[in-house]
């Protein structure tokens, strides 16, 4: 991760606490959408250049493990559901077009999977080093 061992330990402590909260949320059996720049990746394919993956932010074994555990516990990556093609990236740590990572996503309750209609990354205009993830859901509010 970024920021060294202290920052990584702090991040993993936070993720552990978040897991406890998300377990309670999941038990309510309602649909939840959590959007953000997670700075986590579940798969090496989420990095344009995963050659030295252990040094990439969000792709350490502990970070990947946390996210994969979350996905196996009743949550899903809405972007992968709406756009299963590889090679879509949302963050460029160096601020250029090289070394893209897909660290931003919508994490959703599995009961919302059938509601995902389309997913894409808005990259027509650079708004920052992150590109917004857009998901179209078929929901009635």
Show where each model-derived region lies.
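Active-site regions of metal-assisted phosphoester/phosphodiester hydrolases
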Residues: 1-141
């Amino acid at each position: 991760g970024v920021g060294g061992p202290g920052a990584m330990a702090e991040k993993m402590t936070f993720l552990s606490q978040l897991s406890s909260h998300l377990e309670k949320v999941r038990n309510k059996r309602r649909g939840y959408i959590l959007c953000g720049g997670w700075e986590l990746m579940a798969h090496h394919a989420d990095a344009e250049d995963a050659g030295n993956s252990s040094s990439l932010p969000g792709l350490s074994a502990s970070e990947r493990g946390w996210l994969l555990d979350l996905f196996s516990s009743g949550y899903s990556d809405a972007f992968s559901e709406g756009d299963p093609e590889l090679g879509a990236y949302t963050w460029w740590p160096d601020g250029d077009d090289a070394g893209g990572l897909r660290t931003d996503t919508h994490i959703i309750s599995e009961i919302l999977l059938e509601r995902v209609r389309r997913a894409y990354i808005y990259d027509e205009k650079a708004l920052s080093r992150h590109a917004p993830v857009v998901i179209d859901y078929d929901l009635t509010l």
